[in-house]
Amino acid sequence: AFHEGNASMKPLLGGKGAHLAEMTSIGLPIPSGFTITTEACREYLASHVLSDALWAEIRSAMDQLEQREQKRFGDPDNPLLVSVRSGAVTSMPGMMDTILNLGLNDRTVEGLARLTGNERFAYDCYRRFIQMFGDVVLHIPHALFEKHLETVKREEGAASDRELSAAGLKRVAAASLKTVKE
C-alpha cells in the first residue's frame, strides 16, 4: 500500500510510486492504491512468469484496497476499478503505459451506471478501458479502436467524443470488444 513507502524509495517503487507513497505519508488526499516494485517487474521480465509469492502479495494488496474502498473487484453491484500505471525512477511523460478502469466488463459497467446514475459515463469508461487494454496489453493498433469511435460519431452526427450518446458509446464498446476478441 502507498502508506508503506516514501519519496526516498524511487529505485524500488519508481518515481510515481515513491511520490504517491510520500503524498500518502504526509496526509494528502490521494486515491488508495499499491505499487508493484521494480524488483518484481525485473523478475517478471526475466522469467515471463508471476511467481506464486507475487500473486499472493497482489491478492493481499487488492483485498486491503477492497476493504479501504468498500468495493469489490468484479462485483457487478459495487465494482472496484483500478488504474495500472507504469513508472520509472526518472520521469518520462508520455512514454509510459497506462490502463484505466481495470475491473470493467459487461456486468460491472451496468453496476457503475447504476451507482453513478450516468450510463453515458459508465460506457465511456468501458470503451476507454477496452481500447487501452487492447493497445497496451494486446498490441492491437490504436487506429482500429479509433475507427469504431469515428464510425459512431458519424452515425450520430457528433463532432466530438463528448457529444456521443450512451447508446453510441455502448456500440463503440461492443465493436471494440469484438476487435479484442478477434
Question: What would you call each of these model-derived segments?
Answer:
Residues 1-182:
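Nucleotide/phosphate-binding sheet-loop regions of phosphoryl- and nucleotidyl-transfer enzymes
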